[in-house]
Amino acid sequence: MIVTIDGVAASGKSSVASGVARALGVPYVSSGLLYRAATLLALEADLPLDDPTTLLPQLHAHPLRLEALPEGNRVWAGERELTAELHSTRVDQGVSAVAALPEVRAWVDAQLRALPAPFVAEGRDMGTHVFPHADAKFYLTASPRVRAERRAQERPEDVPTIEAALIERDRRDRLQSAPAPDAHVIDTGPLALEDVIGVILAALPARSA
């Protein structure tokens, strides 16, 4: 069984996917962390974010490893854990450019498709491109203001600044963030985390519940 959870930036994908995975007792996989880790490595090496000819060699020189756990994901570059550094503003601002590179997307997709089911996969285009035949697909959305207010609780930045960055991120990600035709679309704005998880669990096919 494969469950995909897509959605716009800061819509709660990671928290929801982790909760669903825990409820089902299966691993949780975050594709976005791999893109963020690639972005961080490029920034630290002062590489252009839109040039795969320099970025891919950097990824091969510092192989990334995604540790998929029901309670969350950890990302490693060798013996160095990157997880705590992957949600900084500079990574937020650069990850769309890296994720738009076909070469990088192919690299991430290959790692994800090699994983054995069952699992809950969270990230952009999980249900449309990476796992189009997933057993169940969900797409999370919320207004930029709601998402900014939530993210402001996680980092020392003001809501208007975060909201402006999210609006720009939405603009850049528009093509990648469209829901699959057969996805369940959920507005997480008026819902608490546990409510969103409950909606998803209730909508799963009976054989995978």
Swiss-Prot record:
It catalyses: CMP + ATP = CDP + ADP; dCMP + ATP = dCDP + ADP. ATP binds at G7, V8, A9, A10, S11, G12, K13, S14, S15. GO terms for cellular component: cytoplasm. GO terms for biological process: pyrimidine nucleotide metabolic process. Its main location: cytoplasm. GO terms for molecular function: ATP binding; CMP kinase activity; dCMP kinase activity. It is found in: Cytoplasm. Its EC number is 2.7.4.25. The keyword Cytoplasm applies. The keyword Iron-sulfur does not apply. Keywords: ATP-binding, Cytoplasm, Kinase, Nucleotide-binding, Transferase. Coiled coil: none annotated. Belongs to the cytidylate kinase family. Type 1 subfamily. NCBIfam families: cmk. This is Cytidylate kinase. It comes from Deinococcus geothermalis (strain DSM 11300 / CIP 105573 / AG-3a).
